[in-house]
C-alpha cells in the first residue's frame, strides 16, 4: 500500500511531464467476469469432427472437377476454417496447379483464372501473372464476362493483392478493378453487393485478419443459394467454439492485468488489454498455441507501458536508468528505479520467468536470450528517440528509419511470437535470420512504422515529440505533406510486394515463420485504418472486437 501511495505522489507531483491524456479502458470487467460452460463446448466438438470428415471426403471427391474443387478451397479459406484442413488443401492445390494450364489455356474465364491465381500464389506457387495477358482489353482494361461480372472483377482485385515487384499487368489490374467495381456497386443486390463493398472498402483477402474476414464472410456466404450447408455449419460452430476460447483467455489475462493495478500505479499509460489481445490473437490464432499467445499478450502489454513511459511520462534521467536496467536484466536494478518503473520492471521479470520455465519444458532454452535481446532492441530504440527529443535533434530519413523501425516494437513482438512454436520450425537459425533483417523482415518493420506514422501525425503534433516519418521525409526532400504522404504510401505498397515475394517457393524458412511476419502486417491494416485505433479505440474497432469475442454467430 505504501508503494502505491508513493507512486501516485510521484506521478501527481510533476506537472511538466509530456502527458498524453489517453482515454481509459472501454471494456471494464466484461471479460473478467466470464464463466465458461465446459459441457457446451464438449458437445460441439463431436459435431465439428463429423462435419470435418464430411468436408474432407467431398474435397477429395472433387479432385476430378476443377471448378468444384477450386470453389471449395476458396470457401474453406474465406470461412476461416483452413487450419482444419491444411493437408487436404495442400493436396487440392497441388492437383489444381497440375491442371491449371490445361483447364485455362483455351478459356477466357476471368473468374476462374483470377481465383486460381490468388489461391495458388498465396500458397507459394510461382504462377506467372502472364496468365492475365489474354484477358487484357487495350492497355489498361480487361475483358469482363457479362455473367458473374461483379464476382469476376472482385476476384481480379483480390488477385492483385498478391502481386510482386515488376508485375505491371497486376498494377494496372488493381486500378481497373477498383474503378470498375465502384462504377457498378450501386446497381448490385445482396449478397454480391456486400462482397463488392468489402472488397472495395474493407480489408483484402490477402491483407485482412483471418478471423475478422471470416466473421464478415460467414453471413454473406449464407445468403448465396449455392452455399454448402456442411461448410457453413462447420464454420459457424468453429467460430463460436473459438470465441469461447478467446473469452476464457481474456478472463485469465484480465485477472493478471487487474493485479498490476494499472489505473492507479500507471495512470499515464494506455489501458488496452483487450485491444492487445485482439492484436496478438490475430498473429497467433491457432487454439493449440494458447500458452504462446498468452505470453505474447503479456509482453505486448508491458511494451505498451514502456512505450508510454518513454513517450508520455518519464524524465530523460529516469529513462536512462530504465534503459540501463533492461540492458543489465537483473532484479538488483529495482533499487535504482523510481517506484512507477519498478512496477513495469518487476512485471517484465515475472513474465520472463514464465517464459524461461516454458522454454526449459520445451527443450528450447536458447530462445530465452533471443526474447531478452528483442526487448533490449525496442527499449534501445525508445531511448534514442528520447535522446533526440531531449536534444531537439532532427534525424535524417535514414537515421529515423533505422531507429523507428526498432521502436515500433514489431521486431520484438515477432521474435516473441516464435517462442511457443515447434522446435523444428522456429530454430536457432530462424531467430538469427529474422534478427539479421532479411528483405521480408525489413519490408514488414518498415511497413509497420510507416503505417503507424501516417495516422499518428496529428496526435504527435499535440505534444513534445520527435517528427514522424512523413514529416522527416517532407522536410528532407522539400515536399508538401501531401507529396510526402504519396511517397510513403508507395513505400508501403512496395513492402507488401516484398512480403508476397518471400512466400513464393522455395522459401528460406518454413511458412509458419513467414506467416507470423505477415499476420502482424495484417493486424496493422485494422489497427491503423484511417486512425490510431489502439490509442483512440473508435466505435468501429469496438464493434469488430464485440463480433469476435462477445457476440456468437446465431
Curated annotation (Swiss-Prot):
Main enzyme class: lyase
Matching SUPFAM superfamilies: Terpenoid cyclases/Protein prenyltransferases (SSF48239), Terpenoid synthases (SSF48576)
Record's cofactor remark: Binds 3 Mg(2+) ions per subunit.
Substrates-to-products reaction catalysed: (2E,6E)-farnesyl diphosphate = (-)-germacrene D + diphosphate
Motif DDXXD motif in this chain: 307-311
GO molecular function: germacrene-D synthase activity; magnesium ion binding; sesquiterpene synthase activity
Pfam families xrefs: Terpene_synth, Terpene_synth_C
Pathway(s) this gene product operates in, as recorded in its UniProt entry: Secondary metabolite biosynthesis; terpenoid biosynthesis
Keywords from the named record: Cytoplasm, Lyase, Magnesium, Metal-binding
GO biological process per UniProt: diterpenoid biosynthetic process; farnesyl diphosphate metabolic process; sesquiterpene biosynthetic process
Cofactor: Mg(2+)
Similarity section: Belongs to the terpene synthase family.
The name this protein goes by in its record: Germacrene D synthase 2
Organism per entry: Pogostemon cablin
